[in-house]
């Protein structure tokens, strides 16, 4: 995927607030705080500062939308599950995240991020179950594989895939540091965009 056009469209702070008027399919990226989402997006888009990398996890409070190649809209969702964020703040974010994922008429697919070094948290499982209930096609990007030795990373990816009941084509090992998995993830996005509307498929 060659990035010829990348334009920030704006933020959505509440489920009934502003959202892009552009009628392109949307791909959402979601993961717990500190999973490496900003670094992954920067590498995927081949930009050093496309998504701001914060030193304080849990800072992002809005959904940020970007026009990619006039082909699709990338939705960068707030990180979930950061322990130091107050319960009140989490209570504000959950309706935004779940409301968007459950009601966006143009959502074509979701990429959920997991850190290869850690077992999925309860928040991760809750998100997976929610996405499964909604029925939206989902890819799991397993991040930070460069933090382990290659053999360890492969074994860990296989272990996580089996534990989560994921097929090989649903999982993309990724390193924002080395760029490993960048082309595979870009290809997975194109496959999501080429799929028929999953809502129509569900109705049938």
Curated annotation (Swiss-Prot):
Mg(2+) binds at residues 38, 60. GO terms for biological process: division septum assembly. Its cofactor is Mg(2+). It holds the Pfam family MMR_HSR1. GTP binds at residues 31-38, 58-62, 76-79, 143-146, 174-176. GO terms for molecular function: GTP binding; metal ion binding. PROSITE patterns: G_ENGB (PS51706). Belongs to the TRAFAC class TrmE-Era-EngA-EngB-Septin-like GTPase superfamily. EngB GTPase family. Necessary for normal cell division and for the maintenance of normal septation. This is Probable GTP-binding protein EngB.
